[in-house]
């Protein structure tokens, strides 16, 4: 009830202005352990059936917050109090950048979806690292999503990813290379097996922490499988599928620029994840993101082969009790099908 009133006010504002107001509050809350504990007591949820050890990291539950919400790693402590099993900060770039011109964030309310053309706006890796360290250590795993600066030519992209990774080596529990945002010109062209191979070979020499590749939902299936195979062969530990889509047919009144996320992406993301899991389940850690807004969809992705999940748009539309609701209902679904834990359900449809 309370969030419905808050949401009504926030949705009366420009989408990015509303986000900035929320972020300001979350940054303030992050500085208070007492308030974070209070939030956790209200909206957190713990159940041993949802715990899992993946790549040497302990996840209290499989539901994470996707990159893009906390671009500068400045409000992680507050965000984790809302029940997330892990968080992904960023996207951070080597140098600070302002992103694309506003307006660049839009709501498609009927479809419970968002469209963003942000363009990796962030304070840069150095300040991102400083923000991260301010409230460390954290209770859950934290991923760091890394991107390429807009002004960097394609020929120097590998050097740019190396530079941003180098600055972030002493923060985070895993790293995600973002080659799939539609909002940096030509970035998606780097989704090819040659560049991906070079990228992960480089990263493996720099860190022993888990490395992930985040892919677009708009790839042809054969291309996607080829790119993923190249990444895993070069040392990637996991694949995050998917980023936002440029398929404007999924909403009634799309804006010209930007990628779509939310419920409009559910079917498309599920379909590409199904193909990904058929080929790479048990060969890599698979993370499903895109249009997950309830326990039923979360459970389907887990049975399809997802060890972990991520949400973003649903958090905007449903508010602070979303994680708790999904996780409670997920436990009920596991029990109904006779699974003793979420670990047993991962990939059940493939067995």
Swiss-Prot record:
It holds the Pfam family DHO_dh. Its main location: membrane. Pathway: Pyrimidine metabolism; UMP biosynthesis via de novo pathway; orotate from (S)-dihydroorotate (quinone route): step 1/1. It comes from Helicobacter pylori (strain ATCC 700392 / 26695). Catalyzes the conversion of dihydroorotate to orotate with quinone as electron acceptor. PROSITE patterns: DHODEHASE_1, DHODEHASE_2. It is a peripheral membrane protein. Signal peptide: none annotated. It is an enzyme of class 1 (oxidoreductase). Substrate binds at residues 71, 116-120, 178, 183, 243-244. It comes from the Bacteria. FMN binds at residues 67-71, 91, 145, 178, 214, 242, 262, 291, 312-313. This is Dihydroorotate dehydrogenase (quinone).
